[in-house]
Amino acid sequence: MGYKKTFRYSTGNPIVDEVGTMNFTGNVIPMVWFKTIRYPNGAPHNNAIHILADIVYWYRPKEERDEESGQLIGMKKKFRDDYLQRSYDQMAETFGLSKKQATEAVKALENMGIIKRIFRTIQVRGQILNNALFIKLVPKRLYEVTFPEEIEENTLSPPKEIPLSVECTSQQKLDT
């Protein structure tokens, strides 16, 4: 497989046709997150947005197909345990952040109710690791920050503003 593939149909724009032959995979960032995932001052929380996109990628199911027929036989999770395991160091490395920035972004997502942090003691290659971070995604809250207009449309009473920005308490400021 080379760079150029043939495109069966044409859009009339050669660049669009060429990009249409590329199979992009990975993280997807809905544009609405830049409006719904924000700091208290109203600025988009870019670090939290990128980390959330990665978390959602891991929670999206992958297709399981029969090798011979190619038929879809089921869906599987992409990670081993009941929840996604990630470390702050992994997230920092992936997104070019400091560990402190990654930690703050994850805490912001938890404060918004989009994820829940779970800390466990685990054993890896015979070594005990305390406080291993597992991330539980909260689908209902993810839906609310991704489709806020649908939440407002479906309410019978006047829509209430969904608290989406992160308010840091003085204790949280001391923790960071």
Spell out what each predicted region is.
Residues G2-T21, L137-T176:
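Charged low-complexity intrinsically disordered patches
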